[in-house]
Amino acid sequence: MKRLILTLLSTAAAVTLAAQPDSLDYRGDYYFSKRSQQESLPVRPHHTVMLGNSLTERGAWAEYFPEAHVINRGIGGDCVAGMAARLDSIVAGRPRAIFLMAGVNDLIFSTIAPEALLRQYERLLDRIAAESPATQVFI
């Protein structure tokens, strides 16, 4: 009986691990709702953008730093690919600075290799540098 239970648990664990994606599917209703809401308030050159996941979204950044003209672009559950997908509306405003909190959900909830995640992260940083070169980026 113990052997049967161990076999069933091992099989369930293997199936669960095999089903984890290499990258997260960030495109749920919540993501699109938050993205739409955020994009309705355009980024301006005097803004400091907080870009990230739920850790960013839940921060009261504008209250903490009122003189910095902070706008919060955090979306709970977001991943590097999701941030890259919404980067156009951010860099179009040529913000003064971007604080980036990215990769946490990728590492916790997907099986993406650290090297692949690093390449996604580098592409995100390269796009910011190319499309908004005067923007300071803080990681």
Regions found by a protein language model. Give the residues of each.
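Solvent-exposed loop/turn segments at secondary-structure junctions
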Residues: 54-58, 76-80, 104-109
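Small-side-chain structural scaffolding
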Residues: 19, 56, 76, 95-97, ...
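Solvent-exposed, flexible loop/coil residues
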Residues: 35, 59, 69, 79, ...
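Hydrophobic residues at beta-strand termini and immediately following loops
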Residues: 73
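Alpha-helical cap/lid subdomain in secreted, periplasmic
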Residues: 63-64, 69, 84-139
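Solvent-exposed, acidic/flexible segments
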Residues: 48, 76, 80, 114-118
